[in-house]
Structure formats: structure tokens, C-alpha cells
């Protein structure tokens, strides 16, 4: 069954001009993303015209829509975003609270969180944060053999080696095993909590007469046996929920809440990111419900009209030196001819449109009768010929200025070949299934 189209009404007027401008802008953006050859500096798409000759349409079959057409799209993404808005607002409020604590609290976030988490003692801060000095060394470690030039300290009668202001969590950088209480570290007594895994981490921060400042995640040694650690509490207590909107065809939301176990102290070197591994994998596709009024039409489409596409390319001349001068080249693509099977699906105020490749068209609706009336196109012949949906494309080129009614240069073969190949590629990648276009009606 053939269909007549009022081509002039469909392509003229404000709506037709707007559609033509959108197609021109789309093709122009595709050319800007391409890697141009060395002899072409730039390509600009200047105009697109539908012409006056309509295509010939013939309905071949009426079936149910493809499953890909039922996949969630932009409309479902907006609905899911609205459903997630209360959760996102709550996450923003919590985040604003934490930011206000960090900005207004003189002692930092750890002091605030220690009281709000129900612990009896505030966190012990570094000396450079609250102005207090570290506690003197109260361990029975013999530091008499340490080089006094490394750690100068005043001599005190009755105390071997004198006093020191080195704290419990001191990294004795560069010391040998005989001078470092490795046995105490390996046995897991209270001295082991503050020894770093690598003594080279804070080697550059050891100064004369004062040990390195402790990290903010370290707690008071007096309470190390009586209450759990709240290391990195401010960073890992809450993580904002994120809604992924990278792909408009897939939408998912993830709300991640990270909290330390109150009965178990985290590792000293664990970062907030590594506390909970990131979610991996793509969520399953969300499909719409199929309804009885959904339908799909296979339509044989033949076109041999005067649709036109105008481009301007700047080519580079390498004489007498590389990229010596650039010449504007005007290309007018017209005389487009194609013969393909179009798919038109209607699903709840949406129209999905695409073309089928020759092999897919043969598998779905059978062989097509050629123009002679008797020959058929078999899939093996399609593979051998590697037929494109665009059977013919005519291009008219103009380069340089016109002198006495004649062009200075014309028919630049390399540029024409490149532009035609890219036009074919754009058409086949953007309009041939599984790629398709969706229109809201």
C-alpha cells in the first residue's frame, strides 16, 4: 500500500525551517567532532534544504514495536528525578550542616562529632590546632642511645637520657631495630596503636626538640582502652546521594551512607573512599509496559530528489611551504538517491524512527524486488557488494575566485571523497538500527 505525502506542507513554513536548521546544526556538530585530514583545516555546514520532490513510501508490514523502543527515555528520567528530589534535599541539608560545623566550630569537626556521637571525651587534636603541647613521654622505652643531635633535650637528674616532648605516636624515622621497640609494636600493646606502617611517612616533619604533629584521626591515649576510635568520622559519617544522569536512556539513583562500626576501630590508613567500595556495574534496563495500542510499521522508502546540503571547507596548500595558504572550498551535495526500509513505531505519544540495514531488512520482511521487476537481492550479494543505503550522491565543488566566469580551480577529488565518506558514515551511524530517533507528539 502506497502513501502520498504533502511534502511542501511538511517541509515549508516555520516548522519546516526549524527542522531544517536542526538537521543542519546536527550535521555541523558531527563534522566538528571529526579528525580532519592534514590538507583540510575546517569544515562548516552552511545550509540544508529538503527540496521539492517527496519520497515514495510503501507499507510492507505491521507488527509490534521493537523491544528497544520500550526502554526508558528522557520522560522517565525526569519522573525519576522528581521522585528522588526529597532524598536529595535531605542529603543537601545534612551536607550543609556538616559544612556549617566545619566553618563555625573553632575546634574543628572532630570536636563537634565526638559530642554528637555520644562519646565522653573529645578528640585529642594536634598542637598546631589547639595551641597545646604534646604530653611528655611516659613509656618505659630507653631512649638513651638516640643520637642527641637528632633529638636534643635538656638533661634531667635521675632520668636516663633526660626528658623529651616526644608523644606516644612518634615515628622514630631512620632508627635501627635495636633502638625501636619493635617487640612492643608486634605484640599489640598500647604502644602499637600509634606506630605508623611506614616510618618514612613523617621523616621530613621531625624537627629539633619536638616530635611530628599527630594526625587529627588519633585519639587521646588515656581513653584508647575505654572507648572506640572515631577516626575520620567527619569524612565518612555521611556521603551525599548521587543521581546519575550521564546516559538519558538509563537512569538510576544510589544513596550511600557510610558510618563506622561503634564496636570496631577502623584502620589508620583507610581513606573515606576505600571504606566502602564504589558501586560497579550497569543497572538493568527499565522497560515500559507494552499496551495493545502500540504498533510498528515497516515502510519501503525510495527517494531520488533534489535535497541539498551545502558545506564550506578550507583546504591547505603546501607550496612553497607546509600549510602556506588556505583556500575556501564550497561543496553542494545534491542528487541524493537511496532505497531502504524505514521503521516507524508509535508508543504512547512517541514516534520512533529509523532505517534497517539491507541484511536486517531481508531477514525481517524478505527479499526486495529490484527495479527491473524480476531480480531479487539475496543476503550473500549484499555482503559482497557492501551496499550502502545512500546509493548515489552527487557533489558540486567550487574553489577560489571566479575569473571571467570560470573557476580558478575546481573538482578537488580528495576533499570531495572525504566529505562524501563522512556524510555516508553520519547517515548510517545515526539513522540505521539500532540507532533511532524519537519524536514527541
UniProtKB/Swiss-Prot annotation:
Location of the region described as Disordered in the Swiss-Prot/TrEMBL record: 180-289
Biased composition (Polar residues): 226-245, 253-263
Compartments where located: Mitochondrion outer membrane; Endoplasmic reticulum membrane
Predominant place of localization: mitochondrion
Membrane topology value: Peripheral membrane protein
Family: Belongs to the MDM12 family.
Domain notes: The SMP-LTD domain is a barrel-like domain that can bind various types of glycerophospholipids in its interior and mediate their transfer between two adjacent bilayers.
Family annotation (HAMAP family): Mdm12
Quaternary state and interactors: Component of the ER-mitochondria encounter structure (ERMES) or MDM complex, composed of MMM1, MDM10, MDM12 and MDM34. A MMM1 homodimer associates with one molecule of MDM12 on each side in a pairwise head-to-tail manner, and the SMP-LTD domains of MMM1 and MDM12 generate a continuous hydrophobic tunnel for phospholipid trafficking.
Protein name: Mitochondrial distribution and morphology protein 12
Organism for this UniProt entry: Paracoccidioides brasiliensis (strain Pb18)
Amino acid at each position: 500500500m502506497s502513501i502520498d505525502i504533502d511534502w511542501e506542507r511538511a517541509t515549508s513554513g516555520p516548522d519546516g525551517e526549524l527542522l531544517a536548521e536542526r538537521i543542519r546544526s546536527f550535521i555541523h556538530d558531527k563534522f566538528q567532532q571529526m579528525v580532519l585530514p592534514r590538507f583540510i583545516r575546517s569544515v562548516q555546514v552552511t545550509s540544508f534544504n529538503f527540496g521539492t520532490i517527496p519520497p515514495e513510501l510503501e507499507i510492507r508490514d505491521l507488527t509490534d514495536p521493537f523491544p528497544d523502543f520500550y526502554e526508558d527515555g528522557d520522560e522517565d528520567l525526569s519522573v525519576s528525578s522528581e521522585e528522588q528530589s526529597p532524598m536529595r534535599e535531605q542529603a543537601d541539608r545534612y551536607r550543609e550542616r556538616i559544612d556549617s560545623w566545619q566553618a563555625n566550630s573553632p575546634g574543628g569537626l572532630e570536636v563537634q562529632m565526638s559530642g554528637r556521637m555520644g562519646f565522653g571525651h573529645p578528640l585529642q587534636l594536634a598542637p598546631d590546632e589547639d595551641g597545646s603541647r604534646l604530653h611528655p613521654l611516659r613509656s618505659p622505652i630507653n631512649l638513651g642511645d638516640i643520637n642527641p643531635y637528632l633529638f636534643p633535650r635538656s638533661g634531667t637528674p635521675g632520668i636516663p637520657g633526660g626528658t623529651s616532648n616526644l608523644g606516644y605516636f612518634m615515628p622514630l624515622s631512620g632508627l635501627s631495630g635495636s633502638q625501636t621497640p619493635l617487640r612492643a609494636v608486634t605484640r599489640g600493646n598500647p604502644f602499637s596503636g600509634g606506630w605508623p606502617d611506614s616510618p618514612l611517612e613523617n621523616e621530613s616533619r621531625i624537627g629539633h626538640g619536638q616530635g611530628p604533629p599527630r594526625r587529627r584521626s588519633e585519639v587521646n591515649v588515656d581513653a584508647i582502652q575505654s572507648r572506640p576510635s572515631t577516626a575520620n568520622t567527619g569524612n565518612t559519617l555521611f556521603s551525599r546521594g548521587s543521581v546519575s544522569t550521564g546516559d538519558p536512556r538509563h537512569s538510576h539513583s544510589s544513596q550511600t551512607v557510610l558510618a563506622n562500626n561503634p564496636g570496631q576501630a577502623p584502620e589508620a590508613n583507610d581513606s573515606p573512599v576505600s571504606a566502602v567500595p564504589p558501586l560497579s556495574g550497569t543497572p538493568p534496563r527499565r522497560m515500559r509496559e507494552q499496551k495493545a495500542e502500540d504498533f510498528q510499521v515497516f515502510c519501503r522508502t525510495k527517494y531520488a530528489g533534489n535535497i541539498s546540503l551545502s558545506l564550506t571547507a578550507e583546504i591547505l596548500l603546501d607550496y612553497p611551504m607546509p600549510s602556506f595558504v588556505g583556500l575556501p572550498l564550497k561543496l553542494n551535495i545534491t542528487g541524493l538517491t537511496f532505497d531502504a526500509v524505514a521503521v516507524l513505531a508509535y508508543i504512547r505519544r512517541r514516534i520512533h524512527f529509523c532505517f534497517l540495514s539491507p541484511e536486517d531488512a531481508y531477514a525481517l520482511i524478505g527479499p526486495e524486488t529490484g527495479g527491473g521487476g524480476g531480480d531479487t537481492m539475496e543476503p550473500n550479494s549484499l555482503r559482497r557488494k557492501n551496499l550502502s543505503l545512500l546509493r548515489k550522491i552527487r557533489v558540486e565543488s567550487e574553489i577560489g575566485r571566479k575569473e571571467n566566469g570560470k573557476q580558478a580551480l575546481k573538482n578537488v577529488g580528495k576533499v570531495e571523497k572525504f566529505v562524501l565518506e563522512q556524510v555516508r558514515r553520519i547517515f548510517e551511524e545515526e539513522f540505521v538500527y539500532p540507532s533511532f530517533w524519537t519524536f514527541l507528539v
